[in-house]
Amino acid sequence: MSRVTSGPATAKRHKSVIKKAKGYYGRRKNTFRVAVQAVEKAGQYAYRDRRAKKRNFRALWIQRINAGARQHEMSYSVFMNGLTKAGIEVDRKVLADIAMHEPDAFKALVDQARAALG
């Protein structure tokens, strides 16, 4: 009995890989052997960058909070220390949003942090 190379399972797997490679440039989008490599590498990048995304956003929030705090003559580290001592538990994501969109509310937080530091 001869070996079957074009069975339903193989066709389904090939179709799945080609579908995932849609939008790629050159032979990567329509040649199975090349598409498999491209899709595999894309998965590696996606896995890595899902983790990097968390670090990047935290860094962005810290930069925004620091910029907002420095407008009121206070550094990021001193501001965060003041918030901790004041018992204000607001995460960096929310603080960054307040610093950008509600400067008056952020100034109130800076004043509370300054008061807690003494």
Swiss-Prot record:
Q: Per the record's keyword annotation, is NAD included, yes or no?
A: no
Which Pfam families does the UniProt record give?
A: Ribosomal_L20
- Classification via SUPFAM superfamilies: Ribosomal protein L20
Gene3D superfamilies linked to this entry: 6.10.160.10, Ribosomal protein L20 (1.10.1900.20)
| Annotated keywords | Ribonucleoprotein, Ribosomal protein, RNA-binding, rRNA-binding
GO annotation, biological process: ribosomal large subunit assembly; translation
Question: PROSITE patterns of this UniProt entry?
Answer: RIBOSOMAL_L20
Q: Report the domain of life of the source organism.
A: Bacteria
Sorted alphabetically, which NCBIfam families does this protein's record hold?
Answer: rplT_bact
**Function in brief:** Binds directly to 23S ribosomal RNA and is necessary for the in vitro assembly process of the 50S ribosomal subunit. It is not involved in the protein synthesizing functions of that subunit.
Give the family from UniProt.
Belongs to the bacterial ribosomal protein bL20 family.
Q: Which PANTHER family match?
A: 39S RIBOSOMAL PROTEIN L20
Protein name (record): Large ribosomal subunit protein bL20
